[in-house]
Amino acid sequence: LMKIKFGAGGIASYFDKVKNQEILQTDKFFGGEVIQMTAPGTAWEKVMPVNMNDFDKTSLHEFKTVRAIETPLRYLVEKEAKFSYFTLRERFILNKFSGELIVEADVQNWTGEKARELRIVFPVNLDKSFKASYEIPFGTVEMGRDEIDYSILPENYECQFNPDKYGRKDLPYREAVNWADVSSGDYRGKGCLFASDMTVHLFRDETT
């Protein structure tokens, strides 16, 4: 159903053989590639934009294969890269019969370096007209259509909705309960459904 090729920092190609479509666009980042950015401030007291200071990514290091297994149901490839402050151990698991891809990432031997943020990148092969939706408690929200404009809320200095913390700006991230969907919005169109145990998802590239 699916064909995967690995590159220097993760998945170089995730090809749907049934639809004859390339799922990822990996000219800048690989699928599942881990990037490191500097995140000044704190998540609760002083929210500040991330920046490119001390930027790092998987493809800048040797990403060696430490285990490769095939079972009747799936393929598993485990790879490892040594960053400056930690060792990344990442597993790519492909279900043979559904095309489902599972990516598991472990950060080992972290040195405790402050103000660093790690992100896992999945560059879906879509143009800027894509539609994104995500799960919330008891429902689904589509970005740009169903969301509340938080900038019109009255100031409340006990939460994030005040000028010093929120700045009356559009949040770059979304908090999803279990899944986020990014697609062309067309019937039988391109896209991906991401089921994740991570809460915060970003839908635009903040690197320069």
Model-derived regions, located:
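Catalytic and substrate-binding regions of extracellular carbohydrate-active enzymes
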Residues: 1-109
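Generic structural signal for residues positioned in beta-strands
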Residues: 3, 13, 76, 119-121, ...
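Generic recognition of stable, solvent-exposed alpha-helical segments in well-folded globular domains
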Residues: 6-9, 72, 100, 113-117, ...
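Generic beta-strand/beta-sheet core signal
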Residues: 7, 104-108, 123, 196, ...
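Acidic glycine/proline-rich low-complexity segments
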Residues: 16-51, 128-161, 165
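Short structured motifs
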Residues: 61-65, 87-91, 136-138, 147, ...
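Acidic (Asp/Glu-rich), glycine- and aromatic
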Residues: 97-142
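Beta-strand-rich recognition/accessory modules
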Residues: 169-208
